[in-house]
Amino acid sequence: MTEAKNYEFQAETKKLLDIVINSLYTERDVFVRELISNSADALEKMRHEALTCQEVLDEDLPLEITIDLDEEAHTLTISDSGIGMTEQELVNNLGVIAHSGSGSFYAELAEAVKKDVNLIGQFGVGFYAAFMAGNKVRVQTRSWDGSQGHEWLSEGAGSFTITPLDGLARGTRIVVELKDDAHEYAQDWKIKNVIEQYSSFVSFPIKLKGEVVNTVQALWSRSKSEISDEEYNEFYKFIGNATEDPSYRLHFSADAPLSIKSLLFVPKENFEVMGFGRVEPGVNLYCQRILIDQHSENILPGWLRFLKGVVDSEDLPLNISRQSLQDNALVSKIRRVVTKRFLKYLAEEATRDESQYLQFWSTFGIYLKEGVTTDYEYQKELGKLLRFETSKSELGVPVSLADYLLRMNPDQEKIYYINGASRAAIEAGPYVEMFKKKDIEIVYTLDPIDDFVLSHLQEFEGKKLVSADGADISLDKEEAEDALVDESGVDKAELAELLTWMKEELKDEVGDVLSSHRLVDAPAMIVNADGFMSASMERVLAASRKEQGIAGVDGSKKHLEINGKNPLIKQLAELRKADAGFAGEVAHQILDNAMIQAGLVVDPLKMVARNYKILDRAVSRA
């Protein structure tokens, strides 16, 4: 037998080995993934050669990966029946790195690998990750062309040997003699866990102790017509760690602008609202069935974190690092394609089965609202998916903004909305009175954050979204101009005096007191003067500040609008002349009542004391 040949690693390879061997890694498991990925790649190449070449060594060998463990000898062996390597290929592939070897390249590599060991594979040198756990690595291989087999051997210290080896079948066997602190990689439970996490969907069988351990198929790579509902549901339960079937699933492929295969599921339950805290993203990123990024924060926007599933793209580098994922242009393109496709799917499902979509909306609508407020790029698509009750919708049945548009009056220029704790509370309040009178539909936002959502959306199909508690709402220009003239109410001059007096009396609490052209029956209401901070938005911010221990910051003063036709306001105008002091108490109580109807905070002690004064006056005169 020919003697072993000794080789020195290329200088750049030595540098890389130093990085691998002398650094501490938190993700040591990745070396198993790298070796399995290399085996899968060799098998794929062998499958191609078998189709194009007539003479192939050991042509009847099944294409598979075998893992053998020896706890006593502390070895891990990964074998494949792939394409194998010749002696020269061993030298070229395992002794030389195809890079310029500039100092900056290796400095950057060393720093990045300290943060993320996945970067090793990005440069096509994932094999060297074996030295993370092994103090000696043997590679026994024979090429598919039938040439002499060889053994490559190194301790990762700067040199390697290549020795001819007889009796080898086609393929490659890698034997890792484990370091003292890596003996767990010779135990089947550990290897099973690593395979399940990283290599469950490798397209070739992986056998451990004669048993195939990657039994779940990569359904996303198959045609939809070949897959049953039962297979989809079982796959979802596997990747989503779920017990129930999903409520929605989207399986699609795209070839342009990128090659993408994706299988996404919507769970039936929202675990964030069940007290489990913010859930981590549920979609994993794969490249050719090899896991790149588990629970990826890069492949979908954060507001789609409730989704479970897989995105696979052959266009990505097989071992791209997590740091690179954040800035990678390909990943950004994949993110846009998958996000837009899912939003399109939801829109289609909302039309196909409205009842099922409303169930989805009640469970996961909060995430779509989050998307509107945080992700301008998708606001238009998300706006079509929003659902709210309105003054003309059935009780408890939210509708789309598109449905609202269909019922709009031809001359109506805006979409109006108002927030409240419940539909009943809104309809009992003053803000909808004129809308009812004019038969104008108004959107009911029943969630405290809904005003934030619609203020961020700003418009829908060219129609501006406007909060009905704004000071500049005008539903009828003629009424607005004639607001101070009404024979059934306080006359023009007297009402003007009352407004001036109330503005002075309430100057510490409100920015202005105005005659309302919107109120029909109610005596007064609070309106938002700045056109942005609605009452509900102010409540949300106040609650957030309190939760964070931040001192309260007063917003802009609200305006008080009064209804000169209301009996209480007419009597207040008379009372002001007879008893200005007591009239002041009544004016403050009217303001507090309006504030409470708007959902704003008042001083309860002052309000109760004032209430008793007014009650005492009323009872004493009864």
UniProtKB/Swiss-Prot annotation:
Region (A), start-end ranges: 1-322
Species this chain originates from: Desulfotalea psychrophila (strain LSv54 / DSM 12343)
Protein purpose: Molecular chaperone. Has ATPase activity.
Region of interest called B, as start-end residue ranges on this chain: 323-539
Family annotation (PANTHER family): HEAT SHOCK PROTEIN 90 FAMILY MEMBER
Keyword flag Chaperone: yes
Domain of life: Bacteria
Gene Ontology CC: one annotated term: cytoplasm
Binding partners and assembly: Homodimer.
SUPFAM superfamilies: ATPase domain of HSP90 chaperone/DNA topoisomerase II/histidine kinase, HSP90 C-terminal domain, Ribosomal protein S5 domain 2-like
InterPro entries with a match to the protein in the record: HATPase_C_sf (IPR036890), HSP90_C (IPR037196), Hsp90_fam (IPR001404), Hsp90_N (IPR020575), Ribosomal_Su5_D2-typ_SF (IPR020568)
Protein name: Chaperone protein HtpG
Subcellular location: Cytoplasm
